[in-house]
């Protein structure tokens, strides 16, 4: 699936991934390919994007996560590596 992670000042990730684990406002949410359409507000915490055997970990604070088709968009109020 295609994943993008952006913050107001930069793009942090844009590529293919096998899974995403993100801090929703009410707990962690896991996204795999072919996930149902989904929209949630983000809380504060680690966001992990897995590509095959490697993972990219970011810290996000606020924003939203959207799943449409095979695309996951993460728009964070604040994000860092």
Language-model segments: residues:
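Compact, glycine-rich, soluble single-domain proteins
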Residues: 2-81
């Amino acid at each position: 699936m295609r994943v993008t992670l952006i913050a107001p000042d930069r793009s942090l990730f844009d590529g293919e991934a096998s899974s995403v684990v993100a801090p929703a406002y009410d707990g962690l949410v896991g996204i795999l390919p072919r996930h149902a359409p989904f929209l949630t507000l983000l809380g504060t915490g680690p966001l992990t994007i897995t590509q095959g055997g490697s993972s990219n970990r970011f810290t996000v604070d606020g924003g939203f996560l959207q799943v449409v088709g095979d695309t996951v968009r993460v728009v964070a109020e604040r994000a860092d590596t």
